[in-house]
Amino acid sequence: MINILFAGHQQRWDEYQAPLDEALTDRGLEFSLLPSCPPEEVDYIVYDPSGPLEDFTPYSRCQAVMGLWAGVENVVDNSTLSAPLTRMVDQNLTRGMVEWVVGHSLRHHLGMDRHLFGQDGIWRSEITPLAADRPITILGMGALGRACAEALADLGFPVTGWSRTRKRITGVEMYCGERWFNNALK
């Protein structure tokens, strides 16, 4: 029996319990998924970064911590975390991130804030450069970075990507490793 602790607020538990139960059952796993469990019996933790869990020390048997969100910046430096940290990436998360990145890239590219907030009654004729003349760099080319880079490249932006490890992505000029970080920013 695999003991999985859901470490998050009640609202998140209500939202995630059924989908997690279904996904684990579909994979034929024998598991116990609970919002509380004695720390010494926990095999895995499903971690809500906004939840109350801050000290991972008592979870000595824990084999991995899976974050519910793509961002891990609030837990990656937690000195009590000794188990491997994974993050959840699914189709909807990826799609949402692509929409957000493309939306804000276009917002800045087209100068939408000037149009929305510059309502002083004075007409200003501004010619926006084509996407092909506006390079974009994405730092981090994991599942989310890659999807965003591909979407921006499909819109005609020249996209540069940087990753810690070597990757090949069609339509994206890639740099990898610390040595090439500054080149990606040029």
Where are these regions (language model features)?
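A short, basic/flexible loop-to-alpha-helix module at the beginning of a structural domain
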Residues: Q119-P129
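Rossmann-like dinucleotide/phosphate-binding beta-alpha-beta segment
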Residues: I127-K186
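Short, hydrophobic beta-strand segments that form beta-sheet elements in well-ordered domains
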Residues: L5-F6, G28-L33, D43-D48, Q63-L68, ...
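Short acidic low-complexity segments
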Residues: E30-E41, E54-D55, T170-L185
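Short, structured coil segments at secondary-structure junctions
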Residues: R27, S60-R61, S79-S82, L155, ...
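N-terminal glycine-/charge-rich "phosphate-binding" loop or analogous flexible N-terminal tail
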Residues: M1-D43
